[in-house]
């Protein structure tokens, strides 16, 4: 199917400015990257900015295109039963380049046994593009009658509710959910901000020595997953209260494991994804990722929800984020008799670092310079600085019950460096930031602190203070010296503040 198409397909492809079969740019045909040798000026004035990828190039390479096979070599030797259940594939899109959507369809049809692929459902989350209305309808009706169905939202619903709509339209016993900018071709973890990342597979999988074996994974990337249709219904689908983008994939991972299921990455699956430089849904993706993370934390993470608030550097009480009503999701958890998040950490994601010893966290301000906050400064400098307060994670401080004062983003998993400690080494007048386990005496990293009081080194008795300096940024620098009356505050308290 990759080697040619009918004349009628060729005519229709040309009518919408696209190229099928073996015609078009030769680059990119034989599993190699494609570039435009003589790119023409984009008449629309910035499609790359619009789509977050090179749509001009996409429009000039064939719709039938293979990708490199990066799977373990043993995958090519594997065989599968002929009686696998039929599958519905749901593609979600909004304002996608037409050629990218059609290439996803071609790739899926070309690489999937026909008796397994029952239907393809395209969910248009209220796109603005004319191309994605008449031209898309015309193309799929002509080329894939009965196989490809289009469902359209009358308003922009966001990825989560668009996927739920696709599930409702599906009729096969197995449903696969994919972004529409994919080709058919490590385990997936996440940080305490509930942001997905790749992690090393569990040691048990590594010890097994079989690179083709399924990998137990705590969560998943949201752009490609496959699930039994009825099971997905029984565990509550995706959370329809999630807005726009982010978090739904992490929430599903926690829910599946805590409620008696399992989640796996299949190394022999072959799916490639175009990572867009710009998301089409909203310019404020960080806000919705934060909102959805808090929503998941409130339902599934028990007392560990404080870690999510900490990771985003916002207060637990009155965080300034409306994550909506979670009562129905809490009722679902109770109905399904799901396990605790503590069980999940111990049995599914033991690589997560926990910060239960935190007393207070957030911005640290000094009475002498209240508009400036303690900041980790450049990563390679190992020196804390004062910087105008902005609330980002470089100004996330944590004071622990042991007396550590740590500064910078949480080292959420053992795959990442842990947050550094503020240290008074007793030499000179400047404190340093060091790996907590790397100090010569443990007392050098310990401090006494009370809210609206001094920060005192337990090792030297000197106080962390601020002094004016022409050489320092913003005219202020941190020093350790005899107490001069300066006071400090840390914004957020998990345990009652000590005065």
Annotate each PLM feature.
Residues 1-110:
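N-proximal low-complexity "stem/linker" segments adjacent to membrane-targeting elements
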Residues 109, 142, 164-174:
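Active-site nucleotide-sugar/metal-binding loop of Leloir-type enzymes
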Residues 109-152:
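Acidic donor-binding segment of Leloir-type glycosyltransferases
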Residues 219, 223-236, 241-269:
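A short, conserved alpha-helix in the catalytic core of glycosyltransferases
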Residues 344, 350-499:
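Lectin-like carbohydrate-binding module/patch detector with strong preference for beta-trefoil
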């Amino acid at each position: 199917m990759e080697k040619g198409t009918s004349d009628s397909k060729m005519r229709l492809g040309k009518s919408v400015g696209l190229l099928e079969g073996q015609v078009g740019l030769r680059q990119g045909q034989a599993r190699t990257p494609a570039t435009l040798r003589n790119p023409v000026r984009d008449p629309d004035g910035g499609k790359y900015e619009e789509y977050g990828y090179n749509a001009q190039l996409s429009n000039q390479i064939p719709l039938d295109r293979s990708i490199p096979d990066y799977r373990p070599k043993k995958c090519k030797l594997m065989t599968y039963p002929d009686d696998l259940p039929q599958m519905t594939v749901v593609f979600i899109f909004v304002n996608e380049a037409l050629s990218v959507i059609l290439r996803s369809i071609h790739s899926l049809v070309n690489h999937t046994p026909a008796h397994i692929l029952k239907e393809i459902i395209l969910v248009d989350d209220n796109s603005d593009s004319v191309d994605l209305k008449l031209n898309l309808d015309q193309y799929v009706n002509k080329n894939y009658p009965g196989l490809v169905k289009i469902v359209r939202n009358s308003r922009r619903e966001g990825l989560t509710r668009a996927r739920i709509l696709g599930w409702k339209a599906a009729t096969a016993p197995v449903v696969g959910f994919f972004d529409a900018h994919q080709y058919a071709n490590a385990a997936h973890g996440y940080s305490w901000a509930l942001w997905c990342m790749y992690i090393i597979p569990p040691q048990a999988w590594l010890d097994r020595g079989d690179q083709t074996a399924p990998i137990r994974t705590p969560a998943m990337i949201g752009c490609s997953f496959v699930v039994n249709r009825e099971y997905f219904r029984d565990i509550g689908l995706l959370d329809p209260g999630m807005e726009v983008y982010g978090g739904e994939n992490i929430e599903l991972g926690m829910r599946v494991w805590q409620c008696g299921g399992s989640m796996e990455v299949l190394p022999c699956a072959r799916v490639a994804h175009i990572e867009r430089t710009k998301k089409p849904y909203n310019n404020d993706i960080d806000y919705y990722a934060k909102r959805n993370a808090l929503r998941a934390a409130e339902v599934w993470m028990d007392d560990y929800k404080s870690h999510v608030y900490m990771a985003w550097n916002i207060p637990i009480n009155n965080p300034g984020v409306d994550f909506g009503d979670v009562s129905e999701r809490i009722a679902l958890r109770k109905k399904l008799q799901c396990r605790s998040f503590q069980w999940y950490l111990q049995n599914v994601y033991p690589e997560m670092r926990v910060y239960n010893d935190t007393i207070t966290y957030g911005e640290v301000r000094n009475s002498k310079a209240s508009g400036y906050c303690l900041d980790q400064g450049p990563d390679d400098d190992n020196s804390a600085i004062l910087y105008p307060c902005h609330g980002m994670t470089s100004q996330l401080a944590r004071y622990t019950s042991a007396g550590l004062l740590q500064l910078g983003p949480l080292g959420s998993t053992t795959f990442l460096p842990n947050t550094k400690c503020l240290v008074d080494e007793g030499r000179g007048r400047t404190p340093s930031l060091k790996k907590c386990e790397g100090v010569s005496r443990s007392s050098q990293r310990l401090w006494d602190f009370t809210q609206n009081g001094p920060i005192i080194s337990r090792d030297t008795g000197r106080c962390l203070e601020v002094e004016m300096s022409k050489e320092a940024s913003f005219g202020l620098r941190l020093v350790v010296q005899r107490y001069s009356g300066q006071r400090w505050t840390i914004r957020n308290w998990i345990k009652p503040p000590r005065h």
